């Protein structure tokens, strides 16, 4: 309930952790057998989860935390908060980070690696994982290499997620394109969020307002 979750937040804040990562529970009983014990009808509805997130943001910011975005909070002097204020924050599939240009090597079942412009995932089944390591010397199951369009979109998404704003000129200079022409179809799709007051668009760029930040995944 909202009351019990608020109590949890109150207890956590007493410990003053430098960072907090708070995200939705993913109910996937078909993949995780132990989740069959959880009654799905007792889980909060999407609207309730959104309300929980809003109240969490309000509570933690009142307690002195900076809302980094999506699922992360940090104290003002934490390096994530410092990097965001300086426009140097990054995000990968592990979360927010100050290390933007590092390769990530995933170790273990189902882990994901990011090496240069390529992503790969290890085998998800333990027996298959071990068998493939023995036979091939690696556990890679699938992967993909990013093309130019993927790289451009990755950078645009990263800036929106990290800064909640986007400068058209910066993207144009970095990638040699005209933003409103290259993203013409995407801007049409974004119009719904603009009409709802969640995103502001000017001649210079985009800004995601505070209420829109709750839906940054959808906006991206």
Q: Where would I find each of the regions flagged by the language model?
A:
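C-terminal scaffold of the Radical SAM
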Residues: 1-180
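A generic structural signal for well-ordered alpha-helical surface patches
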Residues: 158, 169, 188-191, 217
């Amino acid at each position: 309930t909202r009351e019990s979750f608020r109590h949890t937040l109150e207890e956590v804040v007493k410990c003053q952790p430098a960072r907090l990562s708070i995200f939705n529970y993913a109910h996937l009983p078909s993949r995780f057998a132990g989740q069959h014990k959880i009654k799905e009808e007792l889980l909060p509805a999407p609207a309730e989860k959104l309300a929980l997130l809003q109240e969490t943001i309000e509570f933690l910011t009142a307690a002195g935390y900076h809302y980094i975005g999506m699922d992360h909070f940090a104290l003002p002097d934490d390096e994530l908060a410092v990097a965001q204020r300086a426009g140097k924050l990054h995000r990968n599939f592990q979360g927010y980070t100050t290390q933007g240009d590092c390769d990530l090597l995933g170790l273990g079942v189902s882990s994901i690696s990011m090496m240069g412009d390529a992503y790969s995932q290890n085998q998800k089944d333990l027996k298959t994982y071990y068998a493939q390591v023995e036979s091939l010397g690696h556990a890679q199951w699938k992967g993909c290499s990013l093309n130019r369009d993927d790289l451009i979109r990755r950078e645009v998404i990263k800036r929106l997620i990290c800064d909640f704003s986007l400068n058209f000129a910066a993207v144009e200079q970095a990638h040699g394109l005209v933003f409103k022409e290259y993203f013409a179809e995407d801007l049409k799709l974004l119009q719904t969020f603009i009409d709802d007051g969640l995103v502001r668009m000017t001649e210079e760029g985009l800004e995601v307002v505070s209420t829109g930040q709750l839906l940054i995944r959808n906006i991206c």
